[in-house]
């Protein structure tokens, strides 16, 4: 099911991007969250 994986990855990336955009002053927390996701 490549399509479902692509959709899941898109949702994760969009959520991470929104978190980084809304909390741009918390860089360390964002980096930890990104590392957990695997980015």
Curated annotation (Swiss-Prot):
Described purpose of this protein according to its UniProt entry: Intercellular signaling molecule that inhibits excision of the mobile genetic element ICEBs1 when cells are crowded by cells that contain ICEBs1 and produce the PhrI peptide. Secreted during production, but the mature peptide acts intracellularly, indicating that it needs to be imported into the cell to function. Acts by inhibiting RapI activity.
Family statement: Belongs to the Phr family.
Further remark: Encoded by the mobile genetic element ICEBs1.
Induction pattern: Expression is stimulated by conditions of low nutrient availability and high cell density.
Domain of life: Bacteria
Alphabetically ordered keywords of this record: Cytoplasm, Secreted
Ranges in a coiled coil: none
Gene Ontology CC annotations of this record: cytoplasm; extracellular region
Residues cleaved off as propeptide: 1-34
Principal subcellular localization: secreted
Record protein name field: Phosphatase RapI inhibitor
Modified how: Contains a predicted signal peptide cleavage site in the N-terminal region, however the propeptide is probably subject to only one processing event, at the N-terminal end of the mature peptide.
Localization in the cell: Secreted; Cytoplasm
């Amino acid at each position: 099911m490549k399509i479902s994986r692509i959709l899941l990855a898109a949702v994760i990336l969009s959520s991470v991007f929104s978190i980084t955009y809304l909390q741009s002053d918390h860089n360390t927390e964002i980096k930890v969250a990104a590392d957990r996701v695997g980015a």
